Amino acid sequence: MKRIIGLALMLVLVMSTLCAPIFANDIPGSTTVSNVPPEATSVAIKTMADVNENTLNPQTQYKFIVTVRDNNNLTDIENILLKLYTNAAGENAADAVENHYTFLFRASDNTWTEIGPGQFNDHLTTGLCVKPSELSVVSDEYKFVVNLSSVTTPTIGGGWTAKWIVTDDNGSSGNNTKTFDVNEYLMLMIDDAKLTISAYPGQNDLQPTENPTIVSVTANYNFNIQCKLSGDLIGSTFRDRIPMSNIKAAQDNTHTGEIKLSDNYGNLWSNMDYGEYIEKDIYWFADIPFPLMGDTYTADFYVRAIKYT
């Protein structure tokens, strides 16, 4: 009998895992954090009552306010520069009372200073300037209190620029600007409260004992000096009259530029250059009519300065 022998074969597949070696190296690296410049995030010009103002009067205090932001904190702030200048003069013009001012806050010693044009903080009220009371914050206000000169150039339509420049202890800076205008300014003073003449009828070219009347004008534009009378000089008792035209005003005691007075203003000095405390003399003269009743005659004398046009 034939026997068939079957073989059962089992295939055993042995999978071997090969372990590859792992190599590790340190990769050097660095991160550079750049200094972020400070920012002048907002600016304003305000009255001392904290009302926003864009048209300023000379000889009046205003707050020039800048809000400063520093990503670290305000201890990084080194200084703040405030420049005021007419657009006609430009930012880099020399300081002058007419058209350019420079002020500085220095954080290292908390000092407020007028760089120019004044030599003694003439246009900066240092005692009213304000820095933040807490410097650990990232943002707060700095306030310059400025009063512009009486001869500061008047403008319309945003003719002046205020520029705040904020610098930190790394020398990085940011800035912001605001335009504004300056009003016209004129002030007149005279040294006489009255004029007195003792006379007889028929006398001419008589001068008051107070001659000359000294007129002092401060203005930021050219001007005329004008004179007039309220009317004829009228006697207090008999009501007789000395005509206005008998009273004259002149630039000196030799009758230079003399004008006869009326109840309308007449120019005695014309197109005078603007400036501070410009002094001019007025000499008064009277012709006394004949005949004339003996009496005390009075009228009001007027002197004014007006813009030259």
Where are these regions (language model features)?
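Secretory targeting signatures
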Residues: 1-30, 66, 162, 213, ...
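Ser/Thr/Pro-rich, low-complexity mucin-like regions
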Residues: 13, 66-72, 139-180, 287-294, ...
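Short, compositionally biased P/S/T/A/G/V-rich stretches that sit at domain boundaries
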Residues: 25-58, 71, 200
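Short beta-strand elements
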Residues: 26-36, 172-188
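Signature of Gram-negative chaperone-usher
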Residues: 40-41, 53, 110-137, 181-309
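A short beta-turn/strand-edge loop motif at beta-sheet boundaries
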Residues: 53-58, 71-78, 90-95, 154-156, ...
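Structural beta-strand segments of beta-rich domains
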Residues: 58-64, 209-211
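Extracellular acidic, Ser/Thr/Pro-rich low-complexity tracts
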Residues: 63-74, 84-90, 168-170, 215-221
